[in-house]
Amino acid sequence: AVIEMTNKPAGQPIGSSKRNSRRNFIKTTSGVVAAGAAVSPAIGWSALKAEEPSRVLIVVGPSKHPPGTHEVAAGGRLMKHGLEHMENLSGVKMDVVEAWPEKSLRDTASTIVFIGDMFPPNRFPNPQQNLAYLDTMMRRGVGIVCVHYATGLHGKDVKPDGDHPLLRWMGGYFANRSCPHHESIAKIFSDATITPAARKHPVSRGWNEFTLHDEPYINNYFGADGNQLAPNVTALATSMLPPESPKRETVAWCVERPDSGRGFGIVMPHFYKNWRVEDLRRLILNGIVWTAKIQVPPGGVRTESPNLTDFNPESVEFVRRPAKPKYP
């Protein structure tokens, strides 16, 4: 499979995959994914279709992490490809941009997905304007998703008490060590077991407990009330971390906002290779679909296992950068 790479103007969508599906999926010229009447008998469910074509806007922010980690551009393309090739859901459009999205994309998005080093609206030029535009989207009921470090905020991004719109839009965030009010923890764990925490929630459909070598952030920030999740925030996945002093940490969560919008945050994957983990990938794609107000299929979003090299990462495996020379 080859992912089409084009030099689009900033804020314009990047080309989609040309891969031919083996399950009779067709991409129309309008960009809507259409499917046959039913999926494989082995799955046993009729393919669902969004009531109206929904649009997922994936925004890739800057990243300076070593090859094989974060790989935000490849991760954005991978999520788009997965949503384009869902085996049991159709009627969804996707766009990916690597800059602040143009108004036409913001106006038509059902949900906006961020991946990057720290919360991209604060990292792109004109952060206050970006947040104002995003606020307009949120007031309209648009969903929001942040993946791994895109959940993160610097101390300079937040008020002294930790307030930031992301806390309301998504229900929580990763507080960088520069934050004055709280410090979340970023540490790589050799065996982090991720456990479903809300079995009846639609985002929990079809994925089971899994263990992986990764960097699920812990001590994430959920508000000034003793760092407890707000009543409209649901813990979706937890992990007993750190191993030397374990407590139940929330590593994926969602919110249903008063403006009718939905938010979903997940603090993995750090290592690009972990996109191979089917349960993790399904959890993320379920979350995106749910925030777009699309019915999550009974067994969760079903996709083929991706070939990670297809999405043009710097590296699938982690490559440590040479240490900088020390001069006398």
Model-found features: residue ranges?
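N-terminal secretory signal peptides
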Residues: 1-24
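C-terminal segment of N-terminal export signals and the immediately downstream linker at the start
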Residues: 18-19, 41-60, 65
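Residue-level signal for short, function-critical loop segments
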Residues: 62-63, 150, 269
